[in-house]
Amino acid sequence: MVLLLTVARPGASHAAWSMHAGNAQHTALSTVPTQPLQAVHWQTPVDLKPQYSGDVLYIHYGSPVITEANTVILPVKVGAADTFRVEARRGSDGLLLWQLPTDYQPPPHGWVPSVGLTLAHQGRVYFPGAGGTLLWTNGLDTPSAHTAVRAAFFGNAAYASNPAAFNASLRVCTPLTADSEGTVYFGVQAVIANPLGITNAIAAVDESGVGRWVSVGAASEGQAIQVATNCAPALSRDEQTLYIACRGNSSTPGFLVALSTSDLSTQHVRPLADPATGLSANVSNNGTATPMVAPDDKVYYGVLENPFGVNAQRGWMLQFDAALNPAGAPGAFGWDHTPSLVPAAAAPVYSGTSSYLIMTKYNFYAGTGGNGENKIGLLDPLVAQVDGFSGETVMKEVATILGATPDPDAGPSYPTAVKEWCINTAVVDPFTHSVLAGAEDGKLYRWDLATNTFSETLVLTPGLGEAYTPTVSGPDGQVYAINNATLFAVGASNVGVLPPGPDVRALELGTLTPNPFTMRTRFSFRLPGERHVRLEVIDVAGARVRTLADGTFDAGEHWMEWDGRDGARHASRAGVYFVRLTDGSSTVARRVLFTP
């Protein structure tokens, strides 16, 4: 059923980048076309006291998140030691709107762990605090003084009874992941004993501040000891299952666990094995590997090989079904990276049968068995080939592309070596058939999936201090990349600074209500003038599920609803979808969860 009603009241806002890799499935899909990589619009430091070791920064900078009204919220390291604050900046020009300190202390580490924020549907941003707690604030787009509210997964009263003891003991150790109802999931390390006897744990806090947790030992059925540092929890498309990696006190043994989001009870535990040797795979606390959940409910997760180095330090990208059974050949590179999802329709170079492909870092490190020919790759999860280095059966390479900048530091033994790809997530833009990623050479690239070329390159820095970092896109199509401890906002050279407040010339897509929904959800869109628009429902792979409208509409607001059915009027599967509005030159989208 599609219901149309024209009224004349203001519309609502645009799409957002909500957490690590964009969403709770970590697919890194942009919901709007990205701007051309032509100019730096603004920049701001994400580390006020970067600690260089030579020209290297041993830190994983956390991902910015971006609200629907285009406010960019980012974690900022403020001291030489591990001290942080959160800043909110206007996406159009980088103007500082507000900032808040956090008393967060990361767990013991080699590389400084990422400080991972998440947006929640009730207009909040959550960020880690001391003692395993979360801090949140709202009014995110308002330039005013903000205060933080604390939420302890073990109860605020318990925390208040002895904050010093909990601060000394408990450390949030992963980026935060929020579901569509505002519950936030994360991992916790207990570095010393605490008054409640809480051990290493997987925790959740709902929007009312009520928490729950399960020990890693219980979650893994007695097999693991701690959550892997930097592993952002991933949610199934229906948000009924949480996936997270755990490990022993050292990097082995490693496990992937699936928990019920309702009570954190264990559904499945999968020991992670090196596909070549059969030994337990390495799960490193110095990496950033995070599960990615695909539209067919497969789970992809990257590990290091065991023994270390036998696969040229590339690791493996493992794939599992929803119950964590092995479900296909591994990718030949996996560790320190969250794979991105590329809809097959967004990759004209592809002619196979899979509905999606896997975009991955594909480095081949010099001096570790590789030749330094560092690439990024596009893999087919349904088809296999023999890897030229290991001789193992791996996911088929649909396309790969070599980094553009020679690496003389690799030495004369590696004349074809190039600078490596320093990314822990990329951005996939299905509208322009491209992937956006940064490299160690200080440049931001657009990889054109129609021509298998770098169609755009923008120099951000001379290539100094390139820590492993995320790439992010905003609701206006602006692209964000971190290079040399600085966040760069990148886009078209002819884009001027926008005034504060809504752009009256823009398309606007209202909030979907209810969300999640079981029968139907209602929403509005607003047009600044008469124009031809298309309104579609798409799935997380970018495939069209249903066209709700395709025609010319008058200026003003138009109300519609979606009943959860596809174009053939069949009931859609439970999961996350996007309602997308486009007029041919601009696009806005809203996320919705269907739970029939």
Regions found by a protein language model. Name each.
Residues 76-78, 248, 524-529, 539, ...:
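Non-cytosolic beta-sheet module surface loops
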Residues 498-538, 559-562:
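Glycine-centered coil/turn sites that cap beta-strands in beta-rich domains
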Residues 547, 552-555, 559-561, 570-596:
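C-terminal tail/sorting-segment detector
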